[in-house]
């Protein structure tokens, strides 16, 4: 009897150990060239660092194919921060491991590094930043499908992002329903039109290298201008600010407004109807973002477009890791093939 019990215990321990090893995915760091990013006036490399999370069974499964979630990080952030290389409020591989261990369906997670000279690409197409929309939806997706065992169809692809990444997910998602079938927006920034107010600190900057030394909101002005009001004839910044000599510039503000999802969404309603699932959330203490997400919820309701909308007690970052693990990943597990 004792030998039998000991044998069973040994088998249990061995089985547990095997499971512990199996539930940890593998992380790869690759470079994916963007032809549409070549020659950007910021001078950023078109060879972008990309992090790829492969689920635990990927190596051993042989021919199995997996759904893919393309995850976009926020402004001033980088892949190194989101992937746990540098201390940050989130560690994607750890969170995905935990979600899969809790029963969430296995999937591949892909994050391109969109940190640029002006601290963030805004995931927009511009002569100054390069064509980031096309890079994400066309070039990156094509590369991942060619080099990994993916479900190479829109029904197996999701697009998500936080803050600037949430903006990018909606912007790109509205234009590429043939590429993705599910969207999730985490505290998406920049939904509403606006250019703020005159910023004397921004007007005092004439060297691109000085942008990195500026405060967060001044950096955001330059990133937004590079994406939405580029100017190839205005070196060395190659952009137009929405203010000049302390006065707002209506023509530039109009360009910024044209890039606000709440301003452009009406023309993309047929595309949004193509999505199997759309989710979005924001912390109640994250203003004005929570307010604009609520407005987006109202617009989608007006058009009778099915979606999930949730607010929670939190600010812009303090519960993002938890939300990714417990809401976003299960959302895609339920909606992707």
Label every model-predicted segment.
Residues 3, 17-18:
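Compositionally biased regions
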Residues 19-337:
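Non-catalytic cap/lid and distal C-terminal segments of serine-dependent acyl enzymes
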Residues 13-15:
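N-terminal signal peptide c-region/cleavage motif recognized by signal peptidases
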């Amino acid at each position: 009897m004792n030998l039998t019990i000991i044998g069973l215990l040994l088998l249990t321990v061995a089985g547990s150990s095997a499971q512990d090893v199996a539930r940890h995915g593998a992380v790869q760091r690759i470079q994916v060239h963007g032809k549409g990013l070549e020659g950007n006036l910021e001078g950023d490399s078109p060879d972008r660092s990309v992090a790829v999370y492969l689920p635990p069974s990927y190596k051993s499964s042989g021919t199995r194919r997996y759904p893919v979630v393309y995850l976009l990080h926020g402004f001033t952030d980088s892949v190194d921060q989101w992937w746990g290389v540098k201390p940050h409020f989130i560690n994607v591989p750890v969170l995905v491991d935990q979600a899969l261990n809790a029963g969430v369906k296995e999937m591949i997670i892909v994050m391109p590094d969109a940190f640029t000279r002006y601290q963030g690409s805004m995931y927009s197409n511009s002569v100054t930043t390069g064509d980031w929309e096309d890079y994400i939806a066309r070039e990156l997706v094509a590369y991942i499908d060619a080099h990994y065992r993916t479900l190479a169809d829109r029904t197996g692809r999701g697009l998500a992002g936080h803050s600037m990444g949430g903006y990018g997910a909606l912007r790109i998602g509205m234009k590429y329903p043939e590429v993705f079938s599910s969207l999730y927006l985490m505290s998406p920034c920049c939904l509403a039109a606006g250019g703020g107010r005159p910023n004397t600190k921004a007007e005092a900057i004439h060297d691109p290298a000085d942008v990195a030394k500026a405060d967060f909101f001044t950096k955001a002005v330059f990133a937004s201008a590079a994406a939405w009001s580029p100017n190839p004839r205005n070196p060395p910044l190659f952009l137009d600010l929405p203010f000049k000599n302390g006065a707002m510039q209506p023509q530039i503000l109009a360009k910024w407004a044209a890039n606000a999802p709440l301003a452009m969404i009406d023309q993309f309603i047929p595309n949004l109807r193509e999505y199997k699932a759309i989710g979005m959330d924001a912390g109640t203490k994250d203003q004005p973002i929570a307010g604009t997400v609520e407005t987006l919820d109202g617009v989608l309701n007006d058009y009778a477009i099915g979606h999930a909308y949730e607010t929670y007690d939190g600010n812009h970052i303090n519960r993002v890791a938890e939300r990714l693990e417990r809401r976003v990943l299960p959302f895609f597990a339920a909606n992707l093939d």
